[in-house]
Amino acid sequence: MSNIPAELKYIASHEWLRLEDDGTITVGITDHAQDLLGDVVFVELPDVGDIIAVDDEISVVESVKAASDVYAPISGEVVAINEALEDDPEIINSDPYGEGWFFRMKPDNIADYEALLTADEYENEL
């Protein structure tokens, strides 16, 4: 069974979100997603300053098995990206909920975050 931290929010397309103390939201892919992908070899990230809307294609993850799009879970502005992934994308495999985060965003509406799946709800989607 995949690791599904209870303190995070999720969407059915296997992204996780964490609300930070400063009101930004960190986004990455779940342990289940990285397991399905296999060894990650490349990640294309959004640009800082990008304005994104729900369901926009915002990143691409390439692995030895497949390429997969990552979609915006909520609307907002990208305020930081994980530049470490450019040189070391396999961090996603070893630490998907920690050092393997993709980007941080300032949400347009925090209620959109609150409405996402809980860990239990996400687990039921698997």
UniProtKB/Swiss-Prot annotation:
Binds 1 lipoyl cofactor covalently. SUPFAM superfamilies: Single hybrid motif. The keyword Cytoplasm does not apply. The keyword Magnesium does not apply. One of its GO terms (cellular component) is cytosol. Keywords: Lipoyl. The modification N6-lipoyllysine is found at K65. Residues 24-106 form the Lipoyl-binding domain. It comes from the Bacteria. Pfam families: GCV_H (PF01597). GO terms for biological process: glycine decarboxylation via glycine cleavage system. The glycine cleavage system catalyzes the degradation of glycine. The H protein shuttles the methylamine group of glycine from the P protein to the T protein. The glycine cleavage system is composed of four proteins: P, T, L and H. Belongs to the GcvH family. This is Glycine cleavage system H protein. It comes from Psychrobacter arcticus (strain DSM 17307 / VKM B-2377 / 273-4). The gene is gcvH.
